[in-house]
């Protein structure tokens, strides 16, 4: 059984874009760009009992992070922004809200399309 949700994003701007949308307690962790296996394990070890989600950019860096997560945390669910927006931070909040809603996150009603 999971003890809460943990959402992993790339950077501070991604976190700031997503935080106001959520209507539940979610731990949001930042990789601060591309990281290695050791740093990833250090980041995620305290959250091993959480349900893991990733929300990385639709670019090469995001692809590398998704591949790293697949190898070491295959249970993590990957959320994806539309290639049109490319980055989480530039994706409109209402679009992010719909992606989060589909993944069973509770969101504030003002962001529902």
Regions found by a protein language model. Name each.
Residues 1-7:
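A short, flexible N-terminal coil/short beta segment enriched in small residues
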Residues 2, 20-113:
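TOPRIM fold recognition
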Residues 7-8, 54:
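Conserved SAM-binding loop
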Residues 11-12, 58:
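Helix N-cap/beta->alpha junction signal
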Residues 14-17:
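Short N-terminal binding/cap micro-motifs at the start of the first secondary-structure element
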């Amino acid at each position: 059984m999971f003890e809460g949700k943990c959402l992993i994003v790339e950077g501070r701007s991604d976190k700031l874009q997503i935080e106001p949308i959520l209507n539940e307690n979610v731990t949001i962790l930042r990789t601060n760009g591309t990281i290695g296996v050791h740093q990833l394990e250090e980041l995620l070890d305290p959250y091993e009992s959480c349900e893991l989600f990733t929300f990385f950019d639709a670019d090469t860096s995001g692809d590398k992070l998704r591949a790293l997560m697949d190898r070491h945390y295959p249970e993590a669910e990957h959320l994806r922004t539309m290639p049109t927006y490319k980055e989480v931070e530039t994706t409109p909040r209402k679009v992010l809200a719909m992606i989060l809603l589909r993944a069973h996150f509770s969101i504030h009603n003002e962001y529902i399309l």
